[in-house]
């Protein structure tokens, strides 16, 4: 329970920072209707959607915002899905992301301790179409070459092969 409360708190803090700075944010799911920011004109609340619809929406979005939950040393499928759908992934930092991605080249990251800098990072992407396309293209190539389920299966098979030796 405490874990879930923390995740909701962090996610709402990120959204609050963006909408209070004038950035419009589309969110999905009925739980947002209970948010203290539900009446903010910059928070656009949509109904729940399924996984496939989520991928379609990512493909139509210039930016896909991700907030990591408990795995601060890894990454989530949402990051790869955003990249594979040509959407700039904006996510909080993890040790894995910092080691495997390049800020401003194939991902945009933010630090939760400096959340006040996030709106400017998002505005920069929204205002610079060339930058957006540059990040999207690089992210797509990175995800396609390193972060598909086939890539993961090959990696696990390699590990298993090394264990058998």
What are the residue ranges of the model-derived segments?
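Conserved catalytic-core segment of nucleotide-activated headgroup transferases in glycan assembly
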Residues: 1-59
């Amino acid at each position: 329970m405490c874990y879930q409360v923390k995740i909701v708190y962090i996610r709402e803090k990120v959204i609050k920072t963006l909408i209070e700075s004038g950035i419009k944010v589309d969110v999905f799911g009925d739980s947002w209707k209970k948010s203290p920011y539900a009446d903010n004109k910059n928070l656009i609340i949509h109904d729940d959607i399924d996984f496939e619809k989520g991928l379609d929406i990512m493909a139509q979005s210039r930016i896909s915002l991700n907030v990591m939950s408990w795995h601060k040393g890894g990454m989530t499928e949402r990051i790869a899905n955003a990249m594979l759908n040509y959407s700039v992934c904006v996510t909080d930092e993890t040790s894995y992301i910092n080691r495997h991605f390049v800020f401003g080249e194939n991902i945009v990251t933010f630090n939760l301790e400096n959340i006040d800098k996030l709106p400017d990072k998002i505005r920069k992407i929204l205002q610079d179409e060339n930058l957006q396309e540059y990040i999207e293209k690089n992210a797509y190539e990175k995800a396609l070459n390193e972060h598909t389920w086939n890539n993961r299966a090959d990696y696990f098979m390699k590990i298993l092969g090394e264990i058998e030796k």
